Amino acid sequence: MTKVRLVPWSEHDFQLLVRLNAPEMTQHLGGPETPESIQLRHKRYVAAAKSGTFSDDEKGYAAYIFKAILEPDGVAVGGVNFWDRDWNGETVYEMGWGVLPEYQGRGIASAAVGEAVELARATQRRSAIHAFPSLDNGPSNSICRKAGFELRGEVQFEYPKDHWMQCNDWVLRFAS
């Protein structure tokens, strides 16, 4: 069984974010971000990992940002995050993840998502967590299914800003 440990994002994780921004990693997300955007994202990740909050246009919202460490090797192999999102009149968590190409297909993303779901549940702040993989991202849609998410259907989704894509809306409701 694949063992993954989630560790809060740190200032030392910039190169991991650069690698997660590679074309093969962002093909389902509208392509790579600019170097400037990645630097800003890294700063937001570090700040959120320290404070538990993202700040956007003077509005703050909860965010949990982690790198995924493959055990027992202790190697950073990707990231998994969840954050507050208003969705269909409800404040829920949204989750996203990525695993470096050379580590894909080994159950690492599934293990990391499973760990993150348990962390999200433990916050007791939200009743559900959603994931929005693009329709053509078979592996991420499979991860949602394996993690116990329920497929709600197709939706138009903006990510990154000003880029609209067709996604599946997966939800996992936490028992109250």
Locate predicted features.
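Acyl-donor (CoA/ACP) binding surface of acyl/acetyltransferases
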Residues: 1-28, 65-176
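Helix-loop element at the rim of GNAT/NAT acetyltransferase active sites that forms part
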Residues: 19-36, 44-50
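Charged, solvent-exposed alpha-helical segments that act as regulatory interaction surfaces
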Residues: 30, 51-55, 73
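Sparse recognition of residues in long alpha-helices and their boundaries
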Residues: 33-34, 54, 90, 160
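An alpha-helix initiation/capping motif
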Residues: 35-39, 138
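Amphipathic alpha-helical interface surfaces
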Residues: 38-41, 78
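A short helix-loop-beta-strand connector motif used in the catalytic cores of GNAT acetyltransferases and
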Residues: 46-67
